[in-house]
């Protein structure tokens, strides 16, 4: 009788575990996350990845937002002056619309992946005209289709000073005003972001530089809606700058520790202004740093322990 009782208990336990696994498999991370009042749980992608059936199936099931990994960057959209190419970006935006996903426009102004013809500009009026035209053309094409734009990206040094770039050299920090005011005039409904990495501590120079500059720019009337951070450790400090929202924008974690991923999710849940999280890719196979296995799905597109831990935490 005792043996039978133990057998029944074991069967019941196994059934409960199986049911839990099935429930996890049927649950979308995006649905679980947004059930807590957040806007989305997203990922980075592009046409090549969305045409991979294994990758696409995961994107469609688990994510509610897409960030183009490369197809909206300047070298992709305007490789030569006045000559625009939107093929890759169009594919991603259309896919997102068809599947009810939000899109993060990434990125309008960045010192990297910048065509040499832009980097070579030395005249203030020329660069101002080029900057306005680029932002206007790209944003007009997707007006009303982009939830938020990374208007300026990675513009700070580690000490919080402005990074040297063609934009800061020729225009000083006024390029920030030009970019945001142009973006607001083109698509008033889009959320406009400043995005950066290594915002790891409220006391870190880069974080302090971000917060102080954003406070100053907001006071001057520059229309910055949000700060995007590629980590989660200083969300409260970033939110204190006066922006209406913050987001975790390019998340990957070397080794994909379950606890670290859960900590990120809990950090966003704990900051009212944090609207969402975007992981930088689906599978380790396609990650820009694949050797460190930083994502939620392994190289065979199978969910890792961190994926299950997030679902369990939500």
From Swiss-Prot:
InterPro entries in the record: GH10, GH10_dom, Glycoside_hydrolase_SF
GO molecular function: endo-1,4-beta-xylanase activity
GO cellular component, one term: extracellular region
SMART domains per the UniProt record, alphabetical: Glyco_10
Pathway linked to the protein: Glycan degradation; xylan degradation
Induction of its expression: Expressed in presence of xylan and repressed by glucose.
Signal peptide feature range: 1-19
Disulphide-bonded residues: 268-274
Domain GH10 residue range list: 23-313
Top-level division of the source organism's lineage: Eukaryota
A biological-process GO annotation: xylan catabolic process
Keyword terms: Carbohydrate metabolism, Disulfide bond, Glycosidase, Hydrolase, Polysaccharide degradation, Secreted, Signal, Xylan degradation
Enzyme class per UniProt: hydrolase
Gene3D superfamilies in UniProt: Glycosidases (3.20.20.80)
Summary of the function given for this chain in its UniProt record: Endo-1,4-beta-xylanase involved in the hydrolysis of xylan, a major structural heterogeneous polysaccharide found in plant biomass representing the second most abundant polysaccharide in the biosphere, after cellulose.
Protein name: Probable endo-1,4-beta-xylanase C
Species annotation: Neosartorya fischeri (strain ATCC 1020 / DSM 3700 / CBS 544.65 / FGSC A1164 / JCM 1740 / NRRL 181 / WB 181) (Aspergillus fischerianus)
Chain's gene name: xlnC
């Amino acid at each position: 009788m005792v043996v039978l009782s133990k057998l029944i208990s074991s069967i019941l336990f196994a059934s409960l575990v199986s049911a839990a696994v099935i429930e996890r498999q049927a649950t979308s991370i995006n649905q679980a996350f947004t059930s807590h009042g957040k806007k989305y749980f997203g990922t980075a992608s592009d046409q090549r990845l969305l045409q991979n059936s294994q990758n696409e199936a995961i994107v469609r099931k688990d994510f509610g937002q897409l960030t183009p990994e490369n197809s909206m960057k300047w070298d992709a959209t305007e490789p030569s002056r006045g000559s625009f190419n939107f093929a890759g970006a169009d594919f991603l935006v259309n896919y997102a619309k068809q599947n009810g996903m939000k899109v993060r426009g990434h990125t309008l102004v960045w010192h990297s992946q910048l065509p040499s013809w832009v980097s070579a500009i030395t005249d203030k009026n020329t660069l101002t005209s080029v900057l306005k035209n680029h932002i206007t053309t790209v944003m007009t094409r997707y007006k009303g289709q982009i939830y938020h734009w990374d208007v300026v990206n990675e513009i700070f040094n580690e000490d919080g000073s402005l990074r040297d770039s063609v934009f800061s050299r020729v225009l000083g920090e006024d390029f920030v005003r030009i970019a945001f005011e142009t973006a607001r005039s083109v698509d008033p409904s889009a959320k406009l972001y400043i995005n950066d990495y290594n915002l790891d501590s409220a006391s870190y120079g880069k974080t302090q530089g971000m917060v102080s500059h954003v406070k100053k720019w907001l006071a001057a009337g520059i229309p910055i809606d949000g700060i995007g951070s590629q980590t989660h450790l200083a969300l409260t400090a970033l939110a204190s700058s006066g922006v209406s929202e913050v987001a975790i924008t390019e998340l990957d974690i070397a080794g994909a520790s379950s606890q670290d991923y859960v900590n990120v999710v809990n950090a966003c849940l704990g900051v009212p202004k944090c609207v969402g999280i975007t992981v930088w890719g689906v599978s380790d196979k396609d990650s820009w740093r694949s050797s460190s296995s930083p994502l939620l799905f392994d190289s065979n597109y199978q969910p890792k322990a961190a994926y299950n831990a997030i679902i369990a935490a939500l």
